[in-house]
Regions:
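N-terminal active-site segment of His-dependent metallophosphoesterases
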Residues: 1-70
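His/Asp/Glu-rich metal-coordinating catalytic cores
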Residues: 50, 61-136
Length: 136
């Protein structure tokens, strides 16, 4: 049996400007990060082989170093899980471009399409969301 978690629209590092005070927004951002860690704990407990993140991992093109470091370190801490990432309309193709050492278990799709084999029973194929400008 193949166990895969599909998640999307995490919107990590959101500013939460419209509804919260600065302190409430920071508290909410921390809760988002803890929810990600809880998802990973669930994945470990259930012996999940892969996690597919289908868009809008982050809320804007500019991601704080703290959030990026947290996200990448949590992936590195779980080499037994393969992570597959498709950009959404809030993500940018530069999201991971300047990261020097991406975890070996993080697989990025592209707007040209890409395929990854999780094991002998599951092939993941995807085409990322592309902006109008990227499509030209």
């Amino acid at each position: 049996m193949v166990k895969l978690i599909h998640t999307a629209d995490l919107h990590l590092d959101s500013a939460f400007r419209s509804r919260f005070t600065k302190e409430e927004a920071e508290n909410r951002r921390q809760k988002q990060l803890m929810a990600w860690k809880e998802l990973l704990s669930f994945a470990v407990e259930k012996k999940v082989q892969g996690i597919l993140i289908a868009g809008d991992l982050f809320d804007s093109p500019v991601v704080s170093h703290g959030t990026m470091d947290f996200f990448l370190s949590t992936i590195s801490e779980h080499p037994e899980i393969s992570f597959f990432y498709l950009r959404g309309n809030h993500d940018t193709e530069n999201t991971f471009r300047y990261q020097e050492n991406l975890p070996k278990n993080l697989f990025l799709f592209s707007d040209k399409g890409k395929k990854y084999r999780l094991n002998d029973r599951l092939l993941l194929a995807g085409v990322e969301y592309g902006t109008e400008e990227e499509s030209k």
